[in-house]
Amino acid sequence: MDCKYLKECGSCTLFTSYSEQISFKTDLIKQNFSHFYDGKFDLFSSSPKHYRTRAEFGIWHEGSKLSYTMHASEKGKKVFIDECPKVCEQISHLMPRLLESLQDDEILRTKLFGVEFIACKSGTLVTLLYHKKLDSEFEAAMKILASKLDVMILARSRGQKLLSGELNLVDELNVDGQIYKFSLSENAFIQPNKAVNEKMIAWAKECVQSGADLLELYCGHGNFTIPLSFKFKNVLATEISKSSIANALKNCELNGVENIKFLRMDADELMSAFAGVREFNRLKDIKLSDFNFSHVLVDPPRAGLSESVINFIRNFKNIIYISCNPETLKENLNELTKSHKVIKFALFDQFANTHHIECGVLLEAKR
């Protein structure tokens, strides 16, 4: 990737050609997981540039001049940038226009310390972060800027949130030729590499030849849930975030899905419900014994699965595990492979030019 800040900016950590990066990551995964799996490792690569649909930058002030900043490779320092080849073209084209407009407006540039971008099918959301009170004069200036740049703007300060207008964040994913629509909130967790996300979902669908019912933990706004729902009779999906559950319900409507039950419940609560040791009002309309689960899907945070969750999902014949941290995946597989065997293993290069690796594993109960 051609970048004038390469090695100076701390965002990228691999500087070889993309083919060499892929070879390095593939070899690393094979070395660490070959004792779990001796079959073919599926590799899903990324475009080496313009792949990020979400980006965050600091803002540096020098008089009336503003600069985007990133953490430098040298600890404790910043690097001033005017472009980033990793961001998608939708964000890349907007970055200089936004900065110029902010510089020209004293109300909008004063006390601004950060900018965040989310690009999707319906448009771009720009979040402006401030160390000041946001008043009516500010709100008027923000709305003018949003109209000028044809974007949605969200301004945040401590205890304040102002929107330039209606928030309409809707993205589309193309998975095996099927279009899925997703409504997002400004604080939703989204996979920043859209193209690789589509490949991850397609791979997860391939893991299911035929299924009865699916249980999903950590479902978010339904990124995997909704495409996979067409492979199952019924789906029960859990998530702790209230806003994610709200988006997930909206996304069912957008995609005409009626066989998913979403529960705002963490993994420990769900396990208590399955064990019958605690009753939940949230389950008053859901009878767990009515489900015939053939698969469980987990997409945990970097910390991986707790011991109790591992013991719980051992009760399922098929486990689809999406991991954003190979280290905790390896720890979890040490336990899971006592009862299950690895059937498929995939590597997803979500973040080109970095050491980050995401994996997908299909496990099946040993007979």
Swiss-Prot record:
It catalyses: uridine(54) in tRNA + S-adenosyl-L-methionine = 5-methyluridine(54) in tRNA + S-adenosyl-L-homocysteine + H(+); uridine(341) in tmRNA + S-adenosyl-L-methionine = 5-methyluridine(341) in tmRNA + S-adenosyl-L-homocysteine + H(+). One of its GO terms (biological process) is methylation. One of its GO terms (molecular function) is tRNA (uracil(54)-C5)-methyltransferase activity, S-adenosyl methionine-dependent. Its EC number is 2.1.1.-, 2.1.1.35. It is an enzyme of class 2 (transferase). Gene3D superfamilies: 2.40.50.1070, Vaccinia Virus protein VP39. Belongs to the class I-like SAM-binding methyltransferase superfamily. RNA M5U methyltransferase family. TrmA subfamily. This is tRNA/tmRNA (uracil-C(5))-methyltransferase. The gene is trmA.
